[in-house]
Amino acid sequence: SSHRILSLGCNEVPKAGGGNYWEGDQNDARDMFKGDDPNVIRQREMVADLVLRLRNSSMLARKYQLKDIKKLIDDILSDESENGISKSQIMDTIEFGRVVHAEMNAITEAASKGVSISESSLYCTTFPCHICAKHIVASGIRRVVYIEPYPKSFAISLHSDSITLDKEKEDEK
């Protein structure tokens, strides 16, 4: 326990050869310069796939059977009510974004430099998502300290054998 920083990470798009794109990089290919978010595009494609399958199985109401699919998806996703598809779990998917979360960024940065993070602590702003959680567990990080909860994370349910929120049980896992 030397109380030193082993690695740092941030939420950013990775670049070939390691690391991330930074302001001023030549050929900066971050999403903000590409003009789209691949995760949002993929969420829309998943909704369209589901609606098309329902349509092809004659499971959509008659008034939706002949409607243009693009217009139908626009209408479906524009419903911001609690029961609308825009509030569904399918719209919470994060797997298709290009951005590497800060936790994974710090883990890969340490690995690329040959720095062991086993038995270390990770400090982050938000409770880790389920994707980061599996990397945290696999890398041997012992403790995660966070400020904000992240209710959409499935980290606890997917890794209940390895993750606990109860400080008293921390030494058991």
Task: Please describe what each predicted stretch is.
Residues 1-173:
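Zinc-dependent deaminase catalytic domain
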